[in-house]
Amino acid sequence: MTPLDTSAAAIFAANRAQGAVKFDVRLQDGMTRRGRVQESGSLRVRFPSPEAEGLSAVFINTAGGIAGGDRFDTDIAAGEGTRLTLTTAAAEKLYRAAGAPAQIRIALAAAANAHLAWLPQETILFDQARVARSIDIDLAETASLLLCEIVVFGRAAMGERMLSGEFVDRWRLRRGGRLVFAETVRLDGDIGATLAHRAVANGAAAIGTALIVPGDEALVQRIRDSAPSFSGEVGISAWNGFAMARFCAQDAARLRTDMMAVLGCASGTALPRLWLS
């Protein structure tokens, strides 16, 4: 590598966005209160007024989106008996990357009898975006979880589709110290052609996943009974002490509607207000 190459790499690295948020919540006088909050770079968190059913936190990416080489880290811990709902101020946009992929790391933990809800708005992948995301969840045996992620392959309203790029999504769920769910989704190269396969996404422009802990067949049946018809394709099942719903749709709005129906039935509480704005 020539000195010029080294200098170019250093300039590229220096211009990449980085952000990190780390905080915990604890029970105080019967209310969920935030503990120490650490923020750095272009990732911020804000806490609306505490509500009777728990504490809400909203993440804000002041960079306006994520590009190749960016890195964002989130570490959240819900203390014993707390109730915490996490969401984002807007959909996250992943832009075209000419070099290294963006790195997103999310670590969530919930202690005994805590309830943690991770409910971000959509992640939108632009054509030729590259991103590697990891979501690690560590639950106590008696903790509960409501988690969803929606991924949109391009902005359909603008006539855009993600045709190529790289999307790696690694999920790990531990409950009571045991690994109960592990999955890695990898899409690269001609992503448009891959999504067009009937056995993959049947041409869907948006996909989603919801995890519900604890979850069983009774919960699955209750969701099916309460929402007998969906706008897109939805599959729901339960095993190993949790329930999972998978979503595919031709547009993000329909998928969001289906996701809200499932989450509303599973939680029995209102979704974040930002989802309704």
Swiss-Prot record:
Annotated membrane-spanning segments are none
Q: Which InterPro entries match?
A: UreD
Asked whether the UniProt record includes Chaperone among its keywords, one would answer: yes
Chaperone: is it a keyword of this entry?
Answer: yes
Q: Name one GO cellular component term.
A: cytoplasm
Q: Which UniProt keywords apply?
A: Chaperone, Cytoplasm, Nickel insertion
GO MF, one annotated term: nickel cation binding
The record's subcellular location field reads:
Cytoplasm
Question: What are the coiled-coil residue ranges?
Answer: none
The principal localisation class reads: cytoplasm
The record's comment on protein family reads: Belongs to the UreD family.
Q: What is annotated about its quaternary structure and interactions?
A: UreD, UreF and UreG form a complex that acts as a GTP-hydrolysis-dependent molecular chaperone, activating the urease apoprotein by helping to assemble the nickel containing metallocenter of UreC. The UreE protein probably delivers the nickel.
Q: Its biological function?
A: Required for maturation of urease via the functional incorporation of the urease nickel metallocenter.
Q: What is this protein called?
A: Urease accessory protein UreD
Tell me what organism the protein belongs to: Rhodopseudomonas palustris (strain BisB18)
Q: Which gene encodes it?
A: ureD
